[in-house]
Structure formats: structure tokens, C-alpha cells
Amino acid sequence: MEHGSIITQARREDALVLTKQGLVSKSSPKKPRGRNIFKALFCCFRAQHVGQSSSSTELAAYKEEANTIAKSDLLQCLQYQFYQIPGTCLLPEVTEEDQGRICVVIDLDETLVHSSFKPINNADFIVPIEIEGTTHQVYVLKRPYVDEFLRRMGELFECVLFTASLAKYADPVTDLLDRCGVFRARLFRESCVFHQGCYVKDLSRLGRDLRKTLILDNSPASYIFHPENAVPVQSWFDDMADTELLNLIPIFEELSGAEDVYTSLGQLRAP
């Protein structure tokens, strides 16, 4: 197993550069998408009402596209219904302490820390990982203000770590990072959905009300199923002058009292 398959990271050259105004996505706010059979059927039937002027090739392509969308929506509908059955969700039931709180899914790599198999002089942690019988050292840098950020998040939300990296790396790193026990649960790569070459964090599988669920992640691909629930964050590698997490604290303080995150995020996204 290669080193790169252990840790899922953003590449420095692909990092999404966000302005302060862009900390919250500019996509339009929406209520939870009604993934129901009627919507899926509508997509199927829509292709039958294309104008007669369309060429047979265009019509065939349109039908194929509509049918693909319908199947995708129907599948996600069935998946959503399945994960509403007790015992099938990724997360345990909400504790009494977290009743009424918003659930915030928080990414690890390039959001809270940056890790490397190459030696780093000022590493905050050095974590040994065994790969195919050989022990390798992983050097971990903490993002500036991560301790303050996690402490405040733990006071306000039900916090869940969700990473596309493997548990054999992410679990010991989180043990060192989260000394105060902010994360109520930890989810790793096996809990992701592999979709079009990317590991996606499907929030509908958590077992939480999507109107009371947020995700903080540096990779838009991670929340492609639920962009309306996302608070984007700029990828971090080694800039010790970075203040992104510090700047996010007042944003999350405002969101913590939301009855519906779609409405509150929409207000934050408004120009």
C-alpha cells in the first residue's frame, strides 16, 4: 500500500483560494431536497415532452440523460430512506448533552492539520504508522488556532470528525489533536461514498436532520451531495500566519442558534 493511499489530501496547486467573503459558499440557499419517487418519475417523463422540432439524435441523448438523472435520484432516495431505519445510520443516537444542537461534520487533512511522510522540523506530532510490515513516521502540523477553534466548537455543537483518510492514520492523529474530547464520533474512509473518483461524505447517511447539519471541509468534492450544508474553508499546508479557523469562530457562533441551517447560510451568503 502506497503512502498516498493512507492519507487523502488536497494538492497545494489545486487548493481552493477563498476570500474572506467566500468563507461561505455563494450558492443559493435551498431547503432539503425532496429526494422522492415523484421527482425521479418526473425526470423520466420529462423526456417524453420534448418539442417535435428536436432531431432524433438530440431526443435520444435527452432521454438518456433524463433517465440517468432519474435513476440517480431514485437511488439516493432509497439510500436516504434506508439510513432513516434505526441501526443503519453512521452515527449513534444523539446524547442528552447534544439534544437540540446542530451537528457539525469537520474534516481533518488540510482543514485542521497538514501531514507529510517527509520530515518536518517543527512538526507538532510524529505518528508511527505501519504499512505492509514497515513502520513509517508521519509528521503532522497543526493549523494555527485549531485548539481555540475546536474548544469553541465543542461548546456549541455536536462535533463529528469525518475524513477520507484511513483510520490507521487519522485515529492516532485525532487522539493527539483532540485532547478535550470535542469529537463525539469519528468517521473514516469506509464511511464515504466513492463517487466519480472522489470520496464523498454523504450527510444523509448520518442519521441527523439535514436542516440541523453543517459540514466544514476544504474539498468541495467531499460535500458535492450537500453543497447547501457546507461552510468551505481554504486548504492549509504550512502558512503559520493563517487565521482562517479564528475567522470562522464568529460565523459558527452565529450559526449555532439556527433552527434551519439553509436559511441561516443563505443569509450569510447574501451580498
UniProtKB/Swiss-Prot annotation:
Cofactor(s) in the UniProt record: Mg(2+)
Annotated site (Transition state stabilizer): 163, 201
Active site residues according to the UniProt entry: 107, 109
GO MF: metal ion binding; RNA polymerase II CTD heptapeptide repeat phosphatase activity
Entry keywords, A to Z: Hydrolase, Magnesium, Metal-binding, Nucleus, Phosphoprotein, Protein phosphatase
Any one biological process term the GO annotation gives: negative regulation of G1/S transition of mitotic cell cycle
Compartmental location: Nucleus
InterPro entries, per database record: Dullard_phosphatase (IPR011948), FCP1_dom (IPR004274), HAD-like_sf (IPR036412), HAD_sf (IPR023214), RNA_Pol_CTD_Phosphatase (IPR040078), TIM50 (IPR050365)
Pfam families in the cross-refs: NIF
E.C. code: 3.1.3.16
Tissues where this protein is expressed: Expression is restricted to non-neuronal tissues. Highest expression in pancreas and lowest in liver.
The reaction(s) this protein catalyses: O-phospho-L-seryl-[protein] + H2O = L-seryl-[protein] + phosphate; O-phospho-L-threonyl-[protein] + H2O = L-threonyl-[protein] + phosphate
Residues annotated with Phosphoserine modification: 5
Record's keyword annotation contains Nucleus: yes
Every FCP1 homology domain range: 97-255
Cofactor annotation comment: Binds 1 Mg(2+) ion per monomer.
Chain sites annotated for binding Mg(2+): 107, 109, 218
Quaternary structure (record): Monomer. Interacts with REST.
Biological role: Preferentially catalyzes the dephosphorylation of 'Ser-5' within the tandem 7 residue repeats in the C-terminal domain (CTD) of the largest RNA polymerase II subunit POLR2A. Negatively regulates RNA polymerase II transcription, possibly by controlling the transition from initiation/capping to processive transcript elongation. Recruited by REST to neuronal genes that contain RE-1 elements, leading to neuronal gene silencing in non-neuronal cells. May contribute to the development of sarcomas.
Protein name: Carboxy-terminal domain RNA polymerase II polypeptide A small phosphatase 2
Organism expressing this protein natively: Homo sapiens
Gene field: CTDSP2
